[in-house]
């Protein structure tokens, strides 16, 4: 758009808005700290701001907070908390969180392994064009995980993934 990005100025304004309770700014500021855009990278501070925004309903922060707990970035790795935040984000309609909930069920991370539930969540993510869900559904149908084994259906999911470049 012809405008040069000034992350340091952005951080200044995000901080003012975030500290006054603006959940959108809290999420943006958290991302700045998470990636080190305009500030020194500080994943713990990112978790702090993701938590503030998530607690008032920001579904992007809910999903990102799930990532922080899943991967142990800025917080101790805790699959149960990751699953909890992914689930909240997914229930709020976050498309990637639906895929993440599916992965938790598929792998048994933070929740009992349940391939049928994984398939349900992968299907919801696939309906929103999450490419990874196409692949995972292909795997589920190919191996009979949570569904009857069906190589034709598996191949159709793998083809959808390939068409998306996955």
What residue spans do the PLM features occupy?
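Hydrophobic face of amphipathic alpha-helices that form TPR/SEL1-like repeat modules
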Residues: 28-35, 64-71, 100-107, 134-143
């Amino acid at each position: 758009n012809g405008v040069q990005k000034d992350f340091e100025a952005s951080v200044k304004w995000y901080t003012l808005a975030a500290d006054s309770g603006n959940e959108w700014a809290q999420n943006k500021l958290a991302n700045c700290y998470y990636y080190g855009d305009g500030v020194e990278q500080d994943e713990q501070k990112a978790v702090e701001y993701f938590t503030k925004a998530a607690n008032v309903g920001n579904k992007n922060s809910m999903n990102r907070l799930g990532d922080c707990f899943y991967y142990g970035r800025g917080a101790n790795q805790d699959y149960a908390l990751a699953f909890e935040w992914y689930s909240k984000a997914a229930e709020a309609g976050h498309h990637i969180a639906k895929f993440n909930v599916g992965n938790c069920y598929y792998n048994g991370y933070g929740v009992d392994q349940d391939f049928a539930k994984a398939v349900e969540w992968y299907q919801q993510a696939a309906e929103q064009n999450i490419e990874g869900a196409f692949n995972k559904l292909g795997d589920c149908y190919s191996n009979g995980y949570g569904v009857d084994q069906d190589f034709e259906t598996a191949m159709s999911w793998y083809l959808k993934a390939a068409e998306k470049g996955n």
